[in-house]
Regions:
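A generic secondary-structure signal
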Residues: 43-44, 93-98, 122-125
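Catalytic donor-sugar/metal-binding loop of nucleotide-sugar-dependent glycosyltransferases
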Residues: 257, 266-282
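Short, acidic, metal-binding catalytic loop of nucleotide-sugar glycosyltransferases
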Residues: 40-51
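Conserved catalytic core of nucleotide-sugar-dependent glycosyltransferases
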Residues: 113-262
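Active-site-proximal specificity loops/subdomain of glycosyltransferases
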Residues: 56-102
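C-terminal helix/juxtamembrane-tail motif
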Residues: 290-308
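Short beta-strand-to-loop acidic/aromatic patch adjacent to the donor-nucleotide binding site
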Residues: 101-113
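N-proximal low-complexity "stem/linker" segments adjacent to membrane-targeting elements
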Residues: 1-36
Length: 308
């Protein structure tokens, strides 16, 4: 089976009933941030350059698997921080049941202030690379150069390391290496009320049991990143295999890879030898922009407002 047919099989695509779009701008949010982040930073338009804007929230007590309400996708799942990977991949599954997506998904946080011109520029840009260097658009010379490279970008974001990780550089040893990460435990130490929220389904869960995870030194920050149809298919297939259980113990790494969404996405894609391409211009933290006149150099500004 060729790659295109395999991807279409995994993504349940029936082009006779799908809504055709170039891509999806998927903004992950939660019920808590509807009156704050979503209200304050909602994109003015519902579509950019053929890419449809969708906001997703979880509702554990929904009477169906999912439903669309305007530009909102509500999925039947926990609405908690630690379940973000589950929310993301269920969203992908249902989006690919609804839309015939040409390219892929731009996954974004709900606290981003977008430069709409830069956003359209990115969406229209050919998503190819040559040995890790993007070809086409603002980070290369010509579209002809992009076509000459003929290597599709499946996974792109801004890495804190400032580095790419190409498929031939991904080793089994890298994937198997683990660290003890207290990030999620620290978060819940400061948010004890989340354990009492029935929408979060965390009653009796000991977060400290799940601190070991694969070490991911190169990969995108969870602020915003792009995943192609191929990458989305891999994520859906993987989460289907583990029953969307973010507390699943991975025997190969002897760790819990799925509790921190961006790290989990990198782990799954690297396990399938998917290259990661670093892009500095995707976003910048507002606090790091010393000269506010340079704010338009970035596609998005990470405000980090209403964090708590």
């Amino acid at each position: 089976m060729n790659d295109e047919k395999h991807i279409n099989t995994i993504l349940f695509i029936n082009i006779n009933t799908m809504i055709a779009v170039d891509g999806i701008i998927l903004v992950l949010s939660c019920q808590k941030h509807l009156p704050t982040r979503v209200k304050n930073f909602k994109l003015p338009k519902n579509e950019y350059a053929g890419w449809k804007v969708i906001y997703v929230i979880g509702d554990l007590f929904l009477d169906c698997d999912y439903k669309f309400e305007g530009e909102f996708l509500i999925v039947k799942c926990e609405d908690s921080y630690i379940h973000l990977l589950k929310k993301l991949v269920l969203s992908l599954k249902y989006l690919y049941e609804t839309f015939d997506i040409k390219e892929g998904v731009l996954r974004a946080g709900d606290d981003l202030l977008f430069n709409e011109d830069r956003l359209v520029e990115f969406l229209k840009c050919p998503k190819w690379h040559k040995e890790g260097v993007r070809t086409g658009g603002t980070e290369a010379t010509t579209v002809a150069e992009a076509a000459e490279a003929a290597t599709a970008i499946d996974f792109l974001g801004r890495s804190p390391s400032g580095k790419n990780l190409l498929s031939h550089e991904i080793s089994d040893a890298d994937i198997k290496n683990t660290i003890r990460d207290t990030f999620m435990a620290d978060y819940y130490m400061c948010h004890q009320e989340d354990f009492d929220n029935p929408q979060h389904n965390l009653k009796g869960v000991d977060i400290f049991q799940y601190l070991m995870r694969p070490h991911i030194p190169v990969g995108p920050s969870g602020v915003i990143y792009y995943i192609s149809n191929k990458a989305c298919a891999i994520l859906i297939e993987h989460l289907e295999r583990i029953g969307y259980n973010i507390f699943h113990h991975d025997e190969y790494t002897n760790s819990y890879p799925y509790t921190i969404e961006d790290c989990a996405v990198s782990f799954i894609l690297y396990s399938n030898k998917i290259s990661f391409i670093h892009s500095l211009a995707l976003y910048e933290d507002y606090s790091n922009i010393k000269d506010k006149a340079n704010i338009n150099d970035y596609m998005a500004v990470h405000t980090n407002l209403n964090k708590y």
